Amino acid sequence: MRVTDFSFDLPDELIARYPMAQRNASRLLTLDGNTGTLADKQFTDLLGMINPGDLMVFNNTRVIPARLFGQKASGGKLEILVERMLDDKRILAHVRSSKSPKVDSIIHLDGGYEMKMAARHDALFELELLSDLTILEVLEAVGHMPLPPYIDRPDEDADKERYQTVYNQNPGAVAAPTAGLHFDDAMLEALKAKGVNIAFVTLHVGAGTFQPVRVDNVLEHKMHSEWANVPQDVVDLIVQTKAAGKRVVAVGTTSVRSLESAARASEGELKAFSGDTDIFIYPGYQFQIVDAMITNFHLPESTLIMLVSAFAGFDHVMAAYQHAITQKYRFFSYGDAMFVTKKAH
C-alpha cells in the first residue's frame, strides 16, 4: 500500500483548535466495520452502545508540560520538546534552534534552570538537568503544554486541564491520548453503574506520534518506540471478558497498541507486558484482543489512520472520513470522535 492512499483533503476550518466547553459535548460518528454503515450521534449516546460485561480499556498516562524555552551560552534562543524522560535528571528531546547545541554545552532555561547537552542520538538530544530538583518538578514549574503543531496557537492555562484526561495517573506522555478527552467523571460513573468494566493501561505517547511518514511504501515505515504497560489485573479482565463472550473496547489508538503489543509479546496465553513497543498496525494486521474502539479523527497519511483502516477496513474508513468532512465533524486532538467495531477477517 502507498502512504498516499491514506490522503484526504481537509478544510482548515474543520481542525478543532479549542475543545468543546463540556468534555462529552462532542459528536460521535459510528462505523460498523463489517458493513461500513455509518450513523451520526452525540458522544453521550456511547452509553447505549457499550453493554454490561463489556470491558473498556483506557490509557492513564499523564501529559507532562514537555515544551521548554531557553537559550544557549551564545545567547541564541532554543525550544526543547521532551520525547521521553530517561530518569529523574535526564531527558531525550527534540531541540529547535538556529544551530544545534554542542555536546557538553550548557543550556539556560527560562526560570533560571540549567541543562547540559550530554549526547546526541540521531535527531534527538540527551539533556541532563543541573539542579537538585527532578526533571518533572522543573517541567511543572516552567514547562508548557505540548499542543500538537496543527492546533497552531500558544498554549493557554485551560490546556493544562483540557489537554489531559480526567483519569490521568502516570506522568510521561508528550501528547494526550485524545479519545479519552471526551470522558468526564459522570460518564465513567454511568458506565460503571451500567455494569461495564473499566481497566487502565499506560502508554507514554511520544512526540513521534506527530512525525509524518516519510516513505512512499507503508511497509518501509519505521515506527517510533514508546513505553507501555499492561498489568496482570488487566490481562485477567480481558481473559474473563472474552470467556463470557463480551467485548474489549479500547479507548484510543494508544490503548489498542498497548493491548496488541501484549498479545504480540505473548506466545499463546496472554501475559502482562511492560517495556518499549514499536508495534505498527496497518491493513492486513490481525487483531487479537480489541473488538471495538473509540478514536478521534486523525491526520491524513498518519500511522493512526492506517491503524483504524486495519481495524474497520480501508474503504469503510476512507468513506467515513469523507462523510465526516461533508457533515463538518471537528478533526484531530480537540475534535469529535468515532466508535468503530472490528471488521471480521
Swiss-Prot record:
InterPro entries, per database record: QueA (IPR003699), QueA_dom1 (IPR042118), QueA_dom2 (IPR042119), QueA_sf (IPR036100)
GO cellular component: cytoplasm
Primary location group: cytoplasm
Pfam families: Queuosine_synth
Keyword tRNA-binding among UniProt keywords: no
Catalytic activity: 7-aminomethyl-7-carbaguanosine(34) in tRNA + S-adenosyl-L-methionine = epoxyqueuosine(34) in tRNA + adenine + L-methionine + 2 H(+)
EC class of the enzyme, as a word: transferase
Record-listed E.C. numbers: 2.4.99.17
Molecular-function annotations in GO: S-adenosylmethionine:tRNA ribosyltransferase-isomerase activity
Annotated localization: Cytoplasm
Chain's role: Transfers and isomerizes the ribose moiety from AdoMet to the 7-aminomethyl group of 7-deazaguanine (preQ1-tRNA) to give epoxyqueuosine (oQ-tRNA).
Record-given protein name: S-adenosylmethionine:tRNA ribosyltransferase-isomerase
Species assigned in the record: Shewanella sp. (strain MR-7)
